[in-house]
Amino acid sequence: VGYVGNFNFPDNHLWRSRATAAHHNELSPNMGLAYVRKDTRETSRWGMELGFQGGRDSEEFAFLVGERRVDGSDVLRHLHRGNVSYLAPVGKGLTITAGLFNSLMGYESLYAKDNANYTRSWIADNTPYMMFGVNAQYPVSDALTVTAFVVNSYYHLAHPNDQPSYGGRWIWKATPRFTLMQTLYAGPDQTDTSMEFWRLYGNQILEWKGDD
């Protein structure tokens, strides 16, 4: 439960065009969450995540305004994660994950507890918080990890067409404190799936971590 004060005092108590923390000047049950998780490891190669959520932050986070939605979206928005993963004995270990997983784009989380601020940035609310599809992650070295993915759409509960989208990410831990991340995304996110209308998106993040 949260309370966001807005000194513009909108009559409808809403922060327009926002997907998270959108209800202002009132107590708001923004998010409740319960989940189970099992990580992969060499001694137990299968992993999974399953969780359920509810609250006002679960209402619009998985859609773009005006887009067609998947059937049953009002129920599916309560699914936090739902995936299985496998650590394949390939080289240093290839992790394959299928289902609904955390987004490979963006920096802030849908869940306020994971962020520096209670309200998320405009960029975060216009970047997917979750993805539905399959991804494969491989640690090239102790410093460099690469990932490729195929997903159903930019927003996982939107349904502009029946074509998948594609992308990749690399993470380079340059020093113990300094990390560079880049995600590249390409996909047909309109009704017209011609390549001239594809969404091309690059997400670059430089992270500096100080002392604990």
Indicate residue ranges for each PLM-predicted region:
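Outer membrane beta-barrel
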Residues: V1-R16, A21-S153, D162-P164, I171-T179
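A generic structural signal for short coil/turn motifs at secondary-structure boundaries
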Residues: E59, H156-A158, Q190-S194
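Detector for outer-membrane/organellar transmembrane beta-barrel domains
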Residues: D142-T145, G168-D212
